[in-house]
């Protein structure tokens, strides 16, 4: 037989506040793209659950839009990576003066888990880094770094011959960053003969 729980006034007040908030949000309606509303809500829930640090102007704007205003700016990539030791997320500009993304090759415990904006028609301006690995969603793009000095067009053609659709994203300090269509893992056999003495996948992100 089920027993009636004892009254908890504080919990009842919280439940009532939650119901009111849900009702008000539903009454406010949805935007032109319901998936956009879902993405924004997901970002705010993630921000409530974990610390978000940012480095760079574009990263600050995009992170605030995705995760809300509870983001904290840090001085450099070192500080951003250090903050990840206690969990959370780091959002950094792709077009930074130094190729911080290349350092992820030596930090396999960290990886790209999202890219902003994440619209498939837009070029990523900031990458979201986490100590947690991302998994395939069915609609992803991966990020690959190389020190190959070849022209971008030759690198793209070589990867295409191996079955990978690549696009150049950034180049700094002798390193180049490319996006690869789909979810590509670090040990993908198609990358065995990839251009460059130093190269590798540094993570993947869903696209919408």
Residue ranges of predicted features:
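Domain-level signature for soluble enzymes in the chorismate/prephenate branch of the shikimate pathway
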Residues: 1-208
């Amino acid at each position: 037989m089920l027993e009636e729980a004892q009254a908890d006034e504080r919990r009842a007040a919280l439940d009532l506040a939650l119901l009111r908030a849900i009702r008000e949000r539903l009454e406010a309606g949805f935007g032109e793209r319901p998936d956009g509303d879902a993405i924004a809500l997901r970002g705010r829930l993630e921000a409530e659950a974990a610390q978000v640090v940012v480095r760079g102007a574009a990263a600050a704007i995009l992170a605030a839009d995705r995760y809300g205003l509870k983001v904290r700016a840090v001085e450099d990539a070192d500080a951003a990576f250090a903050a990840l030791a206690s969990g959370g997320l780091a959002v950094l500009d792709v077009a930074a003066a130094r190729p911080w993304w290349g350092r992820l090759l030596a930090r396999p415990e960290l990886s790209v888990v999202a890219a902003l904006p994440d619209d498939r028609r837009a070029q990523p301006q900031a990458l979201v880094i986490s100590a947690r690995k991302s998994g395939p969603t069915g609609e992803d793009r991966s990020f690959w770094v190389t020190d190959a000095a070849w022209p971008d067009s030759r690198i793209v053609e070589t990867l295409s011959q191996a079955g990978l659709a690549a696009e150049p994203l950034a180049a700094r300090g002798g390193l180049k960053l490319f996006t690869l269509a789909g979810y590509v893992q670090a040990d993908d056999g198609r990358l065995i003969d990839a251009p460059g003495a130093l190269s590798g996948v540094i993570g993947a992100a869903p696209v919408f």
